Amino acid sequence: DEGCVTFEGLGKLGEDLGIDASSDTKLLVLCWRLGAEKPGCVSEEEWAKLGSEPSLPTCDKPVTLETLKAGWSTLDPAFLENSDFRPFFKFCFEFNREGTKKFLERDTALALLPICIEDRSKHTKTFLEFLETKPEDFKINRDQWCSFLDFSLNVGPAPDFLGWDADESSWPILLDEFVEFAMAKK
């Protein structure tokens, strides 16, 4: 895209910062705080917020690689409260979609989920194992993605899944299937 920092440009920024752009969550936090609206793209207008967005380490400073490096740790999502983390988690889905698609490919979700959710879920490892059993062309929609976060915050770990009620739940079917998968493993 013309006038847009794409995944390739973000990868280059990662190299310049000495980080792995494909696994450093702080890069996603940066894009989220810049207000990136298009999947895989930070516009020039959004990028210009580096010098003015109060939640960024470069606010009111000359925007240089050094100022960004110096404040990089402030972009750690571990500092986000749950009320801020939810919009960030949803952003991770939206930003990593391809174009106008309303879903993530299975392999994208497998790579992205552990980066985005980090240690906020006791279910991540088993959920990733579950997703790997799905066909390669399996897709995850936004409701399933966001519901996994809610599930993670509200349902206890396997094998008990305290807080889970299969008869009364309104979780997406994918999460019902996940619980069945996890219970069969025990």
Predicted features, each with a name:
Residues 1-11, 34-54, 61, 98-109, ...:
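Acidic Ca2+-chelating loop motifs
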Residues 13-43, 53-85, 112-136, 152-171:
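EF-hand-based Ca2+ sensing modules
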Residues 81-119:
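Surface-exposed interaction/gating patches
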Residues 92, 130, 148:
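Residues that form generic nucleotide/phosphate-binding pockets
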Residues 141-186:
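Eukaryotic acidic, Ser/Thr-rich intrinsically disordered low-complexity regions
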